[in-house]
Amino acid sequence: MRVQESYPVDVDAIRADFPILERKVGGDISTPGEHDDDTTPLVYLDNAATSHTPEQVVDAIVDYYHGYNSNVHRGIHHLSQEASVAYEDAHDRVAEFIGASGGREEVVFTKNTTESMNLVAYAWGLDELGPGDSVVMTEMEHHASLVTWQQIAKKTGAEVRYIRVDDDGRLDMEHAKELIDDSTKMVSVVHVSNTLGTVNPVSELADMAHEVGSYIFVDGAQSVPTRPVDVEDIDADFFAFSGHKMCGPTGIGALYGKRDILDEMGPYLYGGEMIRSVTYEDSTWEDLPWKFEAGTPPIAQGVGFAAAVDYLDDIGMENVQAHEELLAEYAYDRLTEFDDIEIYGPPGDDRGGLVSFNLDSVHAHDLSSILNEQGVAIRAGDHCTQPLHDKLGVAASTRASFYIYNAREEVDKLVDAIDAARELFA
């Protein structure tokens, strides 16, 4: 792709690592993988849902399957030992990436951010929450957090409170001070909103939580892929994110937890791998993090996860952040040229790398369908934030989200496709 102006990253070189970006779309989808009748170039702007995977990560996974595929922690033969080393080292690599000095003992591999949230909610929340306690969230939470803690509160008798979102899409921090009090046992907050793009002051919220003896759980699904994150600087007690949003494979995520807290928690799932000893009467558990990883783990995905971290580190997370924020600001500026487009969230220079919006009198799903005909892949719906959309007074929104391989020209193609939709629905 021809570069219009300078970027914080080498877009052309990065795009060369992602063959999928060169494909065309628009043909018959009944036989996935056959693209002979596809004719429309792909413009992929759905990165908040999932990023694409570079060849370096695919190669690492293929190397595992071709070279040392074996179950881990269960064999003394060479392949098992080699796979075990790779899988354990992947934990250390991910820990290093997010600034977790405790290494593998503070990083649990899960399926995704949602499972990480459920692990803490069930393994910690069921034991620690009760009547008179409160869990504080925000009005912009993803369902992974909101629904999980909502249901745990119903089981335990705890109260759920929500920090207000103001008209600009930012948290009302004075309201947060009112809600986080001596009854609060958990503050669960999204770092970067997947709908508004808001970057929340998680360090300040961590301080508020700790002042009253509460823990804080940060949903980092949209932040770890897009900006430098140091969980110890934030002072998060728990922090979760997913591999598939950061150039990694699907089916793997990570839960960071402070070691002393994880030590005190019981397992979430039971079975093989997570036990130390078993009798007919009782069982004891493995050390961290393995007591939380029951059964055969996602070994190939772990290898790919580590490779994705290496890939992003080579680019530099400061550069990743600068690039996606540049594109988000450019998209914000382009979209604000039109009076019939409503944008949700803070201004373009004060958000993460996504823009959610609606075109007047056109449902988000209809707009998405028209954009799809132009080859532009965006996301339409409530983005797993139904209560937030209710607050915004809309059933759905259209979301464009950007990553390291996108360019301004693709934003221009988005705007051109919206123009085509506007003419069609006029």
Swiss-Prot record:
Pathway: Cofactor biosynthesis; iron-sulfur cluster biosynthesis
InterPro entries on file: Aminotrans_V_dom (IPR000192), Cys_dSase_SufS (IPR010970), Cysteine_dSase (IPR016454), PyrdxlP-dep_Trfase (IPR015424), PyrdxlP-dep_Trfase_major (IPR015421), PyrdxlP-dep_Trfase_small (IPR015422)
Residue(s) carrying N6-(pyridoxal phosphate)lysine: 245
Active site: 384
Thermal characteristics: Optimum temperature is 55-60 degrees Celsius in the presence of 0-0.5 M KCl and 70-75 degrees Celsius in the presence of 2.5-3.0 M KCl.
A GO MF label: selenocysteine lyase activity
Cofactor(s) essential for the protein: pyridoxal 5'-phosphate
Keyword Lipid biosynthesis included in the entry's annotation: no
UniProt note on regulation of activity: DTT increases activity up to 46%, but has an inhibitory effect at concentrations higher than 5 mM in vitro.
Biological process per Gene Ontology, one example term: cysteine metabolic process
pH dependence: Optimum pH is 7.5. Remains partially active at pH 11.
Keywords on record: Lyase, Pyridoxal phosphate, Transferase
Subunit structure: Homodimer.
Similarity section: Belongs to the class-V pyridoxal-phosphate-dependent aminotransferase family. Csd subfamily.
Name of the molecule in the record: Cysteine desulfurase
Lineage, highest ranks first: Archaea, Methanobacteriati, Methanobacteriota, Stenosarchaea group, Halobacteria
